[in-house]
Amino acid sequence: YFERSHENTFFSIESNAYKHLTRQNSEQWEYLYPQINYDINNIKDHDFGGNVSLFNDFQNYKNLDNSYSSLASSQINWSKTNVSKNTGLIFDNRANFRIVSSSIDFKGTEKDENTIAFYPQIASKLSFPLIKINKENSQTLTPVLMPILAPYNNYTGPQAVNTGNIFSYNRATGLNNWESGPRINYGFEWFLDIKDNLDI
């Protein structure tokens, strides 16, 4: 494993091998060689006043069935936060676009698979922090509304909603998945700061 970061760039490369001890009389070794990541963050957008970031990933595997799979992903993100001085509303605006190319090579057969997928999305998180402060603590109650516009795709199933991801822009994990379809997330965030350095 090797990684290096400099200012707003990050690069890493790694290779791994896994032995599956529970498999008998068949291939036990699975390989990742290599996985490469190259990211660029905090690129100033002088036209619209936002920030741009780029994330690039490449993965190459040898699987237990002796097939070879590869995945290349490139994603561009744009973000800009606006605060209304008149109303106090906070607008966290984001746009994302990811392109993924994946392939599976079944050696000695004609069943090879090749897929190219596009995942565009536009979203905004509207919030209105309400703050109450007294001698013992400070409390913040924030109503949140998140309209998200994304096309439906055939690669990602329905995503479970829980307290950890209710305000997530994309609940799907993995480079070849993206939460599908237009949606609206809404709810409240509550934060309690007690003067004895206890936060809830």
For every predicted segment, state its role.
Residues Y1-I200:
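Outer-membrane beta-barrel proteins and related beta-barrel translocases across Gram-negative bacteria
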